[in-house]
A protein has these predicted regions:
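Conserved beta-strand hairpin/beta-sheet module of binuclear metal-dependent hydrolase folds
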Residues: 1-30, 115-131
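Active-site neighborhood of phospho(di)ester-bond hydrolases with catalytic His/Asp-centered motifs
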Residues: 13-17, 38-45, 65-68, 127-130, ...
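Active-site metal-binding motif and surrounding structural segment of the metallo-beta-lactamase
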Residues: 20-67
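Active-site environment of divalent metal-dependent phosphoester hydrolases
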Residues: 46-50, 71-73, 111-112, 135-137, ...
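Metallo-beta-lactamase
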Residues: 68-123
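Hydrophobic, well-structured mid-protein blocks that either form specific transmembrane helices
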Residues: 105-149
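Cap/insert and terminal regions of metallo-dependent hydrolase folds
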Residues: 137-175
């Protein structure tokens, strides 16, 4: 789980769930200037969303943004981050970074305090919500007016059942 969102000279990562080298390689393959990445916005503390966050923050000297509960759940998993690069935000407030405005909103997930993001340029709005099992009224309201919506809430039932997850985790994923 890792998305690059850019507008003009501002780029951000939504999650960094891959190894840092893989994120860097993907950005380079997309012919995007990695130096335009100005921050990493985390949706929740699960490893498939934070694996490369610390590495990318240290490599690019950029901040990681997450709400308080997510920071509490991930700070021991991402390595040492400069204090000035540890940004705690409040859900449902709008933050500016370069030429983008980013507004986190709550989503249901079995994590500390998962969020989706509304991202605004001076022209358009886009929304990203990952690991959602169902659409709540809050999600529906936050997606309204978006020119682009990225939703991720799937799994392959055969892969899941044949995989090495515990039965309890398989039941959670299927819920």
């Amino acid at each position: 789980n890792c998305h690059v969102v850019s507008y003009k000279d501002t780029g951000i990562l939504i999650d960094a769930g891959l190894a840092g080298k893989r994120i860097t390689s993907g950005i380079e393959q997309a012919d995007f200037d990695i130096d335009k990445i100005q921050g990493i916005f985390i949706t929740h503390e699960h490893s498939d969303h934070i694996k490369g966050a610390g590495i990318m923050s240290r490599k690019l000297d950029i901040p990681i943004y997450a709400n308080f509960k997510t920071w509490c759940g991930m700070k021991d998993k991402i390595g040492n981050i400069k204090e000035e690069n540890m940004i705690v935000f409040d859900n449902d407030k709008t933050y500016e970074l370069g030429e983008l405005k980013i507004r986190p909103f709550s989503i249901p997930h079995d994590s500390e305090d998962a969020v989706g993001y509304n991202i605004y340029s001076d022209k358009e709005k886009m929304s990203i919500a990952t690991d959602i099992g169902y659409i709540t009224d809050n999600i529906r309201n936050n997606l309204k007016g978006s020119k682009l919506v990225v939703l991720e809430s799937n799994y392959d039932p055969n892969m899941l059942m044949m995989g090495s997850y515990t039965y309890a985790l398989k039941k959670r994923v299927m819920s």
